[in-house]
Amino acid sequence: MASVGGTLRGNGYLWGKKSINQVKLLSMKPTLFVLAAGMGSRYGGLKQIDGLGPHGETIMDYSIYDAIRAGFGKVVFVIRRDFEQAFREKIVSKYDRLIPVELVFQSVDKIPYSYKVPEERTKPWGTNHAVMMGEEVIHEPFAVINADDFYGRESFEALADFLRSVEGKE
């Protein structure tokens, strides 16, 4: 959408230099997009749902707590279907009453229509592919984190501040 004052462009009226869509984006809380579909092959299991804190907290628990306190308004997890039930029980059940939570699934065959999946391909396509899985549920500024990395409170505050300050661009 072009940002030209005083004219109608794209799908929203412009207010000065900001469109209605941009004003809506500025008032939205950012979304936290968590990459949690890892195979855990070196670890030997699903490290993203294994507890390590004094009360069984996962690394994700610390990140989500910090993100909520920083002002994030929704959490979207990208996971694999084969551990959906365990993930819902261990992770989603903790947060779905505190903040909107969405699950999206990474699948090797969910790719842009102009591409063809090689028959021998069994593994997902990586980080960019995982982020593409969120396109139908994320309509606001968002930050992407790994489920098994610790970032700290200050990182989420900086991310949220930045995402709230960004004008919507299409």
What are these regions (language model features)?
Residues 20-34, 40, 54-144, 151, ...:
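Conserved N-terminal catalytic core of the sugar/cofactor nucleotidyltransferase
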Residues 45-46:
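Conserved catalytic-core motifs of eukaryotic protein kinase domains, centered on the activation segment
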Residues 154-170:
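Conserved donor-nucleotide/metal-binding helix-loop-beta segment in metal-dependent transferases, i.e.
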